[in-house]
UniProtKB/Swiss-Prot annotation:
Residues 52-100 form a coiled coil. Residues 1-19 form the signal peptide. SMART domains: OLF. Keywords: Coiled coil, Developmental protein, Disulfide bond, Glycoprotein, Secreted, Signal. Residues 131-387 form the Olfactomedin-like domain. It comes from Xenopus laevis. Interacts (via coiled coil domain) with BMP1 and (via olfactomedin-like domain) CHRD. One of its GO terms (cellular component) is extracellular space. It comes from the Eukaryota. It is found in: Secreted. This is Olfactomedin-like protein 3. Glycans are attached at residues 174, 234. InterPro entries: Gal_Oxase/kelch_b-propeller (IPR011043), Olfac-like_dom (IPR003112), Olfactomedin-like_domain (IPR050605).
């Protein structure tokens, strides 16, 4: 009996001893579970708060985007209205300029005429090679191709051929010409990567150069100004000549880097220049493209002052004028070598407002367009022609 009681006491004691760690473990587990539940509840609270803040931020962004869209529409409307007003002002200015044109340059200096005498009178009559009888009545369109290079420069096609190649002279002095196979390559964002570089044997000066019938005619300045005829096919000099012109001065008052400007029209090659002897007005000469000899020379009534460029169309010299603070360029003086155009009957032609001033303007006889360089922008002007009989 006593043994049974002892056994029961031992069993109870062992049970108590083994049950105590289990209770501690359960209590520990319950504590950890409570902490986890608390953290989960806290995470839910934070998640709800963050969701609310994100929703508020999204609403703010949407509201800001809506306001930006409204402001953009408002700015677009303002720009359209401004453009309409500018166009209206341009038309009004054109009308005022048409009703009150600046006086054309028609008077010839009597002293200049007497000084040259019979020598010049012998060459007053010019025998035309073609039957071209067009004159410029209006600049009908302007196309801005791109902006490339320096503020001064020249770009042109071959003015006596059907080639689509583009030739670019960057700056007012260098020894490299860029050649592009087509207009597409020139208008690319990085055009120099598509260009073939032509290194000339002598550096060129000014922007009075030209590509004509596969040859490059450019101006070299040594002791005297020299015209170089360079074959683009063989990359060699074919001929060179010093023009019989003494004491040259800049031919354009607003483009001081140009002393000689070689241009082309339906009649062939011409040279526009100025001398100290006749330092007020521009001179013109007919150039033989084969021998580089001067065929005829004229003193024109067109002033050098405020001239920025010039070109020849059907044997008539058109001089483009501007102001020192660039405004709208205009053809204000016309000199016809055959004497069939009277300056009084030629209207003043205005060019569209652009960026600065023209450093070069090359007339393309085949396309009836002008390739111009305006403060680093390459521009094409389309011309509207009239028969000379329509002026009278």
């Amino acid at each position: 009996m006593m043994a049974g009681i002892v056994a029961c006491i031992l069993l109870v004691f062992v049970t108590v001893i083994t049950a105590q760690p289990q209770a501690v473990f359960l209590e520990y587990i319950q504590g950890r579970m409570g902490v986890l539940e608390e953290r989960i509840a806290q995470w839910h609270d934070q998640s709800s708060r963050f969701s609310g803040e994100l929703r508020d931020f999204k609403n703010q962004v949407l509201k800001m985007l809506e306001n930006i869209e409204k402001e953009r529409d408002s700015l677009r409307n303002e720009m359209e209205n401004t453009n309409v007003r500018v166009n209206r002002l341009e038309r009004e200015v054109d009308y005022i300029e048409t009703q009150n044109p600046a006086p054309p340059c028609v008077e010839i200096d009597e002293k200049l005429s007497d000084h040259h005498g019979a020598k010049k009178k012998k060459k007053e009559k010019y025998q035309k090679i073609t039957d071209c009888s067009d004159t410029i009545s209006q600049v009908t369109a302007m196309k801005i191709l791109k902006r490339f290079g320096s503020s001064a420069g020249l770009w042109t096609k071959d003015l006596a051929g059907n080639s689509d190649r583009i030739y670019v002279f960057d700056g007012a002095g260098n020894d490299t010409v860029y050649m592009y196979p087509r207009m597409k390559e020139f208008t690319l964002s990085s055009p120099t990567r598509k260009a073939a570089k032509i290194r000339l044997p002598f550096p060129w000066i000014g922007t009075g150069h030209i590509v004509y019938d596969g040859n490059l005619y450019y101006i070299r300045q040594d002791n005297e100004f020299q015209v170089i005829k360079f074959s683009l096919a063989n990359k060699t000099i074919i001929d060179s000549a010093v023009l019989p012109i003494e004491q040259q001065v800049p031919v354009y008052g607003l483009s001081k880097f140009n002393y000689i400007d070689i241009v082309a029209d339906e009649e062939g090659l011409w040279v526009i220049y100025a001398t100290k002897e006749n330092e007020k007005n521009i001179c013109l000469a007919k150039l033989d493209p084969s021998s580089l000899s001067i065929e005829q020379m004229w003193d024109t009534p067109c002033p050098i002052e405020n001239a920025e460029s010039a070109f020849v169309v059907c044997g008539s010299l058109y001089v483009v004028y501007n102001t020192k603070l660039p405004s709208r360029s205009r053809i204000q003086c016309v000199f016809d070598v055959s004497g069939t155009i009277s300056s009084e009957n030629v209207p003043i032609v205005y060019f569209p407002k652009r960026y600065g001033s023209h450093s070069s303007m090359k007339y393309n006889p085949r396309e009836k367009q002008i390739y111009a360089w305006d403060d680093g922008y390459q521009i094409i002007y389309k011309l509207n022609m009239k028969h000379r009989d329509e002026l009278y």
